[in-house]
Amino acid sequence: MQRERTNETSLRVVSKEKDSIIVEMINYDNTLLRTLVEEILKDDQVIEARYYIKHPIIDNPQIYVKVKSGKPQAAIKRSIRKLSKLYEDLGAQVEKEIEKYRSNHIIKTTE
């Protein structure tokens, strides 16, 4: 399907079988999709996962996931939850380190 002319992100199920799914990722960056597919591949129930783009300018990327058992969309959801938690923890660590840096580098004035 041709790329939409908006900046909003969304997705669309292109096809769904018992053990596989293809999802079009509308206006998502390849960097994010690569990370998502790498996380999906860590799932023990996943046989295959990949993303591809038919044409880089006019088409949106699609993710393909095939599972041994369970639902393929569940594997995608599990991976998204894991990545969300990872980035949430990373954000908290960054905030903590920035605060620590600030408290160690405050210019102290004398009265």
UniProtKB/Swiss-Prot annotation:
It comes from the Archaea. Its main location: cytoplasm. The lineage of its organism: Archaea, Methanobacteriati, Thermoplasmatota, Thermoplasmata, Thermoplasmatales. Belongs to the archaeal Rpo11/eukaryotic RPB11/RPC19 RNA polymerase subunit family. DNA-dependent RNA polymerase (RNAP) catalyzes the transcription of DNA into RNA using the four ribonucleoside triphosphates as substrates. It catalyses: RNA(n) + a ribonucleoside 5'-triphosphate = RNA(n+1) + diphosphate. It is found in: Cytoplasm. This is DNA-directed RNA polymerase subunit Rpo11. Keywords: Cytoplasm, DNA-directed RNA polymerase, Nucleotidyltransferase, Transcription, Transferase. GO terms for cellular component: cytoplasm; DNA-directed RNA polymerase complex. Part of the RNA polymerase complex. One of its GO terms (biological process) is DNA-templated transcription. GO terms for molecular function: DNA binding; DNA-directed RNA polymerase activity; protein dimerization activity. Signal peptide: none annotated.
